[in-house]
């Protein structure tokens, strides 16, 4: 006999847990189903080395910024363990013995650091920050908007389109032009318009290519930079990032505790085999175990190509929607490298193994925009792992003492690129050789680095797809290209967190605002169900 609930949420990552928490808060009898033996998805903390059971790392995602305060506040996540500490400067050491540091909160230090390379760029930096902040002030709130059905003439849809236009009224003529450029330009071209020094451009390139199957010369990467520059961690500095205490699994744990405290049931080891549909409406799910769970509301927070192409019969969906999901681009060339190191890097540019501010922030490996472009072309054009990989690295244990025993640090490296078809097979030997190159490059900048490595974990696109269901290894559930954003994410007419099946809602990162540990998609899926009066009367 089937179990009955008011709402079933598929996927126990942060979006699923947040969606389940809001349903439970509304009084709905809610169950969240996670296929793995633990919740969290990519926001996970693990102990990957059996020989070092007390060494913990943030497995996949690694830093926090983009979750809106309204979600944190309404679910009281801080009460349940959400605690983010802003990290230090963006730091890049260069082979010539110089380095650059860019702070979120210290314009004077930025001027001093950038002046080594270009006084003109140092003078330009405040104007750049002001310009980007101005655009972000208008665009940031759009993350909380439900995308309208552009082109629809239904009165309700026209009203939603007007609301979006009205929300952007502060841009002005010049601002609209700026936004157009951000959505269409490459990050390289945009930075060339502002700066002359490759060193400062290298530092700013980072946010334009994180997680993308595109190099800095690719159109649209300027938007990716904006996406990563519109959050904060409650410190009042736009674009700041931070470390969650206990690693990113601490974020998921806080979401899980919040959901459970509100009455949601969380089940792990519960893999969904089918979404049950009767007469064009969702009525529940069937698990691989054979168990059926009935509910008038089903929310999927897993990858859309799994949810719509594997868990549903294509005959239950419109043909154009199926084609859009089949053609959804979800490529990646990301490799996550987790290291345990016995001492902090002793950089030639900034000597010393003792803790310094440059250890506490983002420790980059990108010497110029061209460096990043060559790394991408190695994977894209020459179909090999980058000879000189691009790295966004952090050492969270400099500020979070809960992850490792005293005297040991975790260096968490988000690296790019390897060929996108490495998602199809493990490529274990090639990945280890790629990781060797990353370590050697850091060792050339900090000669104690290679010898300090105690243990390492190397995770490629195949691991991300097999373990997390991230098709292609794409951390965003789909590329952040201009044709896969806002009202096009994941398909025209279905960007409002609804689907062609009544009662089935979509709250994965493949919807608007997705990309990063944001939580907005799961929250919006709940809100749409509530608007549709799909949350049971008992739950209201």
Q: Where do the protein language model's features map onto the residues?
A:
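A glycine-rich dinucleotide-binding beta-alpha-beta segment and adjacent secondary-structure elements
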Residues: 197, 201-217, 383-394, 448-512
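N-terminal glycine-rich phosphate/pyrophosphate-binding loop and immediately adjacent elements
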Residues: 3-151, 480, 524
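Extreme N-terminal leader/targeting segments of oxidoreductases
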Residues: 1-7, 25-26, 485-487, 491-492, ...
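A conserved FAD-binding loop/helix module that cradles the flavin
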Residues: 507-530
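Active-site/ligand-binding neighborhood in enzyme catalytic cores
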Residues: 133-262, 269, 470-484
């Amino acid at each position: 006999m089937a179990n009955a609930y008011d709402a079933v949420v598929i996927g126990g990552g942060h979006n699923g847990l947040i969606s389940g928490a809001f349903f439970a808060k509304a009084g709905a009898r809610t169950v969240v189903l996670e296929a793995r033996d633990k919740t969290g998805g990519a926001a996970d903390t693990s102990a990957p080395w059996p020989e070092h059971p007390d060494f913990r790392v943030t497995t996949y995602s690694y830093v926090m910024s983009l979750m809106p305060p309204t979600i944190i506040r309404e679910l009281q996540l801080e009460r349940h363990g959400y605690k983010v500490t802003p990290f230090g400067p963006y730091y890049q050491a260069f082979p010539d013995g110089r380095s650059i540091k860019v702070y979120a909160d210290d314009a004077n230090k930025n001027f001093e650091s950038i002046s080594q390379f270009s006084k003109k760029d140092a003078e330009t930096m405040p104007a750049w920050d002001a310009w980007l902040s101005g655009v972000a002030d208008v665009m940031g709130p759009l993350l909380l908007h439900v995308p309208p059905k552009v082109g629809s003439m239904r009165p309700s849809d026209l009203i939603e389109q007007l609301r979006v236009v009205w929300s952007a009224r502060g841009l002005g003529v010049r601002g609209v032009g700026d936004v157009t450029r951000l959505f269409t330009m490459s990050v390289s071209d945009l930075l060339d318009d502002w700066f002359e020094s490759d060193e400062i451009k290298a530092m700013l390139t980072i946010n334009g290519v994180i997680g993308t199957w595109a190099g800095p010369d690719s159109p649209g990467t300027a938007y990716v930079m904006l996406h990563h520059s519109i959050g904060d961690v409650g410190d009042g500095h736009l674009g700041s990032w931070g470390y969650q205490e206990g690693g990113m699994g601490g974020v998921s744990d806080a979401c899980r505790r919040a959901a459970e405290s509100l009455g949601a049931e969380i089940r792990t080891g519960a893999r969904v085999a089918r979404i049950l549909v009767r007469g064009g409406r969702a009525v529940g799910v069937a698990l691989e175990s054979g168990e059926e769970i009935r509910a008038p509301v089903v929310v999927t927070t897993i990858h859309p190509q799994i949810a719509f192409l594997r868990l549903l019969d294509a005959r239950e969906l419109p043909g154009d929607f199926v084609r859009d999901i089949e053609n959804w681009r979800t490529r990646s060339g990301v490799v996550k490298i987790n290291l345990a190191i016995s001492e902090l890097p002793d950089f030639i540019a900034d000597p010393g193994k003792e803790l310094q501010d440059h250890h506490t922030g983002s420790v980059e490996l990108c010497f110029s925009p061209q460096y990043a472009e060559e790394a991408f072309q190695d994977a894209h054009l020459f179909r090999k792992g980058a000879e000189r990989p691009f790295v966004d690295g952090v050492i969270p244990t400099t500020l979070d003492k809960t992850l490792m025993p005293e005297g040991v640090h975790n260096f968490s490296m988000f690296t790019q690129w390897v060929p996108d078809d490495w998602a199809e097979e493990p490529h274990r030997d090639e990945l280890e050789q790629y990781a060797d190159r990353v370590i050697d490059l850091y060792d050339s900048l900090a000669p104690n680095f290679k010898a300090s490595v105690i243990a390492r974990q190397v995770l490629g696109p195949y691991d991300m797809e097999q373990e997390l269901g991230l098709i292609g290894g794409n951390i965003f559930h789909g590329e952040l290209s201009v044709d896969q954003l806002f009202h096009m994410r994941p398909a025209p007419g279905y960007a409002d967190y609804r689907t062609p099946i009544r009662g089935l809602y979509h709250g994965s990162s493949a919807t608007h605002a997705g990309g990063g540990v944001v939580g907005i998609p799961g929250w919006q899926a709940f809100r749409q169900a509530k608007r549709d009066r799909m949350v049971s009367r008992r739950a209201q």
